[in-house]
């Protein structure tokens, strides 16, 4: 199970990742990229890593929507 703390850390990671990075990867590569960055910040056991992998996969449409919204906002402010 993904703990609330892990969720907060993941979403902070998504917010701190450049939009171009979030949009450049295919789905499976983006999951692995985010998981690798998460593990670099905090050690997690293999079972939690699997839960987090599944959670990220389920949230990919939302992650991409957020990235696209951030991109539109950034382009609109220039």
Give the role of each language-model region.
Residues 1-29:
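N-terminal acidic leader/helix
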Residues 33-41:
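DNA-recognition alpha helix
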Residues 19-22, 41, 49:
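Intrinsically disordered, low-complexity regions
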Residues 14, 30-34, 63:
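Polar low-complexity intrinsically disordered regions
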Residues 43-78:
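Short, charged early-sequence alpha-helical segments and their helix-coil boundaries
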Residues 9, 29, 33, 51-55:
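Amphipathic alpha-helical interaction segments
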């Amino acid at each position: 199970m993904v703990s609330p703390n892990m969720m907060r850390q993941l979403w902070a990671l998504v917010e701190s990742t450049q939009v171009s990075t979030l949009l450049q990867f295919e789905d499976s590569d983006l999951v692995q990229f985010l998981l690798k960055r998460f593990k670099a910040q905090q050690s997690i056991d293999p079972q939690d890593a699997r839960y987090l992998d599944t959670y990220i996969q389920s949230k990919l449409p939302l992650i991409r929507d957020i990235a696209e919204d951030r991109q539109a906002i950034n382009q609109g402010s220039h």
